[in-house]
């Protein structure tokens, strides 16, 4: 069968199996928004504990990025990807069996541990199977899967949870994860040579790298000024996108615009659609024009200007909010260009650890920025409680969104610095 013997076709089977796992990663990552009420009731936890439960995923996810890069370079995407799928699914099953906060917290962290290896593994797979001028497109397409997962984590997940309950629904996701892990082990070979196939023209051979060589590349990365600028871009950009779409985007609409939670979720759904469209589109454009920094600078500048509408106006018309949320998601494409930029600065055998250092910064941003926005909201809250929820103010949200706007503006300035030096 050509599908198995033609390396240009076979690579899509491997990428597709990893993509299924990555979709599940993003469903688990954003599921707490839909599950929040049930988790609060089942585990008898406060809002602060719920926030900590949510953050446990991101903290562990961020911490494993550099080790994942080392492992992906050393052992290849087949072993690391399949192991990650098994670990995150085991964590999901443990989560469904949790009878208290501590077990739930540790289970959620285990999901983050397994999930944390998948994206870097996919990038390593793409480096092994796709040409350099295809990598930006593939990185964007891979990020687009995150948008699809975010969509599944909204209304579809809510319907499933409402009909079957949250524990059976999460258990079903875990079973699917185990099956996807088997598919990864069977199909996602480390390279065409590893699959017994002819090499793909213009795809550089990815030699195995020793731990000593990896340590050398890591030391070089930690002293690389360009890497730190890209890390700031990813911290600010990815952190802002996940914070708005994954957490504060809905409460802002509920408090400031008076929408129901269900109605507000449609706006964050637009953000997820923006991710689905923007990431592969910007990656494709970057590959076609052979430029990385130009679309990054333009995209981040538009991101900052778009986001500034909320802190400046406070209560913009809902169609403007809808467009803002969509463009926030679409901007992920520009943020994602950080990864092919850093990958292309280092030898092929260092692609895993190089992309991991930048990618990890994004998920530290996803853990830090929600908390900083929360501090701003607490500073300006009224002190009233309605239906068990703390009442925040429009001014508090303006300050909170100003924080993310400043973060994105800093990312824009970092990209401009890189562009000028190009």
Report each predicted region and the residues it spans.
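C-terminal ends and interior cores of transmembrane alpha-helices
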Residues: 86-99, 301-315
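Extracytoplasmic gate region of multi-pass secondary transporters
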Residues: 32-33, 219-283, 370, 374
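Conserved MFS/SLC helix-loop-helix module at the cytosolic interface between two early adjacent transmembrane helices
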Residues: 63-102
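Cytoplasmic helix-loop-helix junction between adjacent transmembrane helices
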Residues: 105-148
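Cytoplasmic membrane-interface "Motif A"-like loop-to-helix N-cap segments
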Residues: 74-85, 287-301
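Helix-loop-helix hairpin linking two adjacent transmembrane segments in secondary transporters
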Residues: 137, 141-195
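Flexible cytoplasmic inter-helical loops of multi-pass small-molecule transporters
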Residues: 186-216, 422
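Helix-breaking motifs and short loop linkers at transmembrane-helix boundaries and internal kinks
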Residues: 28, 44, 76, 94-103, ...
């Amino acid at each position: 069968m050509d599908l198995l013997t033609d390396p240009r076709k076979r690579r899509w089977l491997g990428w597709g199996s990893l993509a299924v796992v990555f979709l599940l990663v993003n469903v688990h990552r954003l599921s707490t928004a839909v599950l929040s009420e049930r988790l609060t009731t089942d585990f008898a936890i406060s809002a602060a504990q719920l926030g900590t439960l949510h953050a446990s995923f991101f903290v562990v996810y961020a911490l494993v990025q550099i080790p994942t890069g080392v492992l992906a370079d050393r052992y290849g995407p087949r072993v690391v990807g399949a192991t990650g799928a098994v670990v995150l699914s085991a964590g999901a099953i443990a989560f469904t069996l949790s009878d208290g906060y501590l077990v739930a917290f540790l289970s959620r962290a285990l999901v983050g541990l397994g999930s944390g290896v998948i994206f870097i593994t996919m990038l390593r797979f793409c480096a092994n199977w796709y040409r350099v001028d295809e990598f930006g497109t593939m990185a964007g397409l891979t990020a687009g899967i995150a948008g699809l997962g975010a969509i599944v984590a909204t209304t579809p997940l809510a319907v499933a949870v409402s009909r079957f309950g949250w524990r059976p629904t999460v258990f079903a996701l875990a079973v699917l994860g185990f099956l996807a892990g088997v598919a990864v082990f069977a199909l996602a070979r480390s390279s065409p040579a590893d699959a017994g196939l002819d090499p793909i023209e213009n795809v550089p051979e990815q030699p195995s790298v020793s731990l000593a060589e990896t340590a050398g590349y890591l030391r070089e990365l930690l002293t690389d000024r360009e890497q730190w600028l890209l890390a700031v871009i990813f911290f600010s950009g990815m952190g802002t996108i996940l914070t708005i779409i994954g957490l504060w985007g809905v409460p802002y609409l509920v408090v400031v615009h008076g929408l129901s939670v269900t109605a507000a979720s449609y706006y964050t759904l637009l953000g997820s659609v923006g991710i689905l469209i923007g990431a592969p589109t910007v990656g494709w454009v970057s590959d076609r024009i052979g430029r990385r920094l130009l679309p990054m600078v333009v995209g981040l500048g538009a991101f900052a200007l778009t986001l500034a509408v909320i802190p400046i106006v406070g209560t913009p018309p809902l169609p403007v909010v809808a467009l803002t949320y969509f463009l926030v998601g679409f901007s992920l494409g520009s943020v994602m260009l950080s990864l092919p930029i850093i990958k292309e600065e280092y030898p092929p055998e260092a692609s895993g650890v190089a992309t991991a250092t930048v990618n990890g910064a994004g998920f530290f941003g996803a853990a830090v920025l929600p908390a900083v926005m929360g501090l701003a909201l607490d500073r300006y809250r009224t002190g009233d409680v309605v239906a068990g929820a703390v009442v925040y103010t429009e001014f508090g949200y303006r300050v909170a969104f100003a924080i993310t706007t400043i973060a994105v503006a800093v990312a824009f300035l970092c990209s401009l610095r890189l562009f000028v030096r190009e």
